[in-house]
């Protein structure tokens, strides 16, 4: 196992070689540019190779997973969660689309895959997509999703947004209490946070995806 709470850079596209933010920090570099079958979709062979290269790194920490084309990497990191947990996602898209090619993992469907396949994932808090996109999500998935739409975000002030997140996270992460588990059990579930760069302002991140709500800085979002 590598050092605890590392900053991990997962190099799929080579973009990090052109950026400066990490170069004066201690980071763990995971080279993945030579792995085929990873752009937007990730096939079984690629998953096996990625898991092999990341197996010695802890789930805790900060993982930079390249562009939004590789957001499905969050799903692979979540596989390692060995206790119940909740997931908070900032994204301009739902990432709950049905797969276009059978059951293959994709950047557009990884949240749905996580909800369907990960027993330890109790709730997803999804912040950012528009209401029309969320209406297309499978109703069976919505039972475990708390959704804050782009439209509501745009009319909320900072205090209202902070209140929503604080109250929502407190409620869903108190799952152990709601399930009637023993009082000496740990009260709050771990919270895994995943941020797609398309929710950030273009000064902080320029993406090839739509950035309609991307007015906030990285500091403001996280």
Regions found by a protein language model. Name each.
Residues 2-221:
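Conserved alpha-helical scaffold segments that buttress catalytic/binding sites
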């Amino acid at each position: 196992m590598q050092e605890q709470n590392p900053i991990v850079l997962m190099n799929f596209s080579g973009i990090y070689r052109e950026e400066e933010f990490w170069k004066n920090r201690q980071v763990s570099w995971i080279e993945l540019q030579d792995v085929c079958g990873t752009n937007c979709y990730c096939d079984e062979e690629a998953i096996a190779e990625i898991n092999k290269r990341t197996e010695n790194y802890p789930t805790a920490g900060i993982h930079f997973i390249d562009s939004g084309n590789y957001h499905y990497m969050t799903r692979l990191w979540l596989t390692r969660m060995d206790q119940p947990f909740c997931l908070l996602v900032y994204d301009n898209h739902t990432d709950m689309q049905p797969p276009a090619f059978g059951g293959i993992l994709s950047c557009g469907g990884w949240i749905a895959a996580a909800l369907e396949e990960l027993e330890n994932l109790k709730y997803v808090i999804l912040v950012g997509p528009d209401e029309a996109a969320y209406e297309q999500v499978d109703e069976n998935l919505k039972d475990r999703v708390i959704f804050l739409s782009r439209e509501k975000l745009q009319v909320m002030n900072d205090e209202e947004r902070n209140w929503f997140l604080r109250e929502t996270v407190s409620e869903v992460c108190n799952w152990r209490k709601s399930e009637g588990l023993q009082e000496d059990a740990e009260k709050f579930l771990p919270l895994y946070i995943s941020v797609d760069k398309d929710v950030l302002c273009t000064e902080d991140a320029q993406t090839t995806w739509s950035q309609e709500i991307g007015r906030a800085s990285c500091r403001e979002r996280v």
